[in-house]
Amino acid sequence: MYTKELILDEVNAIREEIGHDEVNIFIEDIYFENNELWIITEDRPDKSAIIGKGGWVVGKLKEKLGLDSIHVESYGDFLNKRYKLKLSKKTIRNIDSNLVGLNNLEKTIDNKLENIYSFNFDRYFSENEFDESENIEAVVALSGGVDSSFSLILAKKLGFNPIAVTVDPGTIILPNQFKKNISTLVESLNVRHEYIKADYSQVIGESFSGSVHPCGRCSKNTGKLVNQYAKDNEIPIIVFGDMLATGSQCINLQEDSLYRLNLPASLSVGKQEIKSLIRNYDLQTFKGFGCPLLYEVHKKFPHMRKFSIQRILRETRSGALEPGEALDLIWSFNKVK
């Protein structure tokens, strides 16, 4: 129905119409399904040319072709994603375990490799229903944010029979709107949930002294508490929403014989994939980056924004964040007054 030549002709006509410079654009492949079009460009500059400034070109192309959506990706990004997925599969397969959830995760990685251009979690889970483990195989660290919520949804869908736990140091780190998300999600998924009360006064005090960035200390403390919960309850896997530890680092054996599984990273997931799945669960989304404590630290000690920006850039380099998403997050720091 659609050819490379047709798409290139339409894109060039739109670029000329809106006054964009004429450029040579190279398309590697196109894929069409369910009134959605995937355009795979040879490289990122070709991708940028098709999207246009502010998404203007691809928006007009979608209107002109009467499509529900158009996805523009570079072939190099897919090569990188395919490589990471193969490493994830190899790492998970090397684990000497008969855990139901890990077996189902490997099947999902295989499916994503087979449908690398068009894999969609909604469609995948509507077409594939997995048996759930009789035993609780995973503890999911649930903060109420998008990444941890996505991780809990996946853990449930993949049959880990998870329990969700939330470390609660108070509203300066875990505000009430996040608790509302937690309640909504665990009820929707029918997942058992527990709060772990914690004293983070030292982390908060050090943060307000300007001596440390709070995220590292907070993450470390939370990890220890979730680890201890899993150990006390003899649950073999702890799941986090980390997007950076991809490939061979997606799952690691801890000193206490627990496995730490970074579920989004294991599937080389980007933010748009996460948002697409969690929008089915009526969760609130929040603009900006981080918790109220981080907001106050940025406000009181502007130099601390540098370390938050470094985190955003790491996620961008890994492909977890698109440059436009990263720019929005960084720009939000300028609204802190």
Task: Mark where each language-model region is.
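Walker A (P-loop) phosphate-binding loop of P-loop NTPases
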Residues: 145
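A short interface-forming secondary-structure element
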Residues: 33-56
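A short amphipathic beta-strand at an alpha->beta junction
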Residues: 62-87
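N-proximal, solvent-exposed amphipathic alpha-helical segments enriched in charged/polar residues
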Residues: 1-29
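Charge-rich, low-aromatic oligomerization/scaffolding segments with amphipathic character
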Residues: 48-63, 90-94
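Nucleotide-activated chemistry modules centered on ATP-dependent adenylation/adenylyltransferase
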Residues: 78-141, 149-337
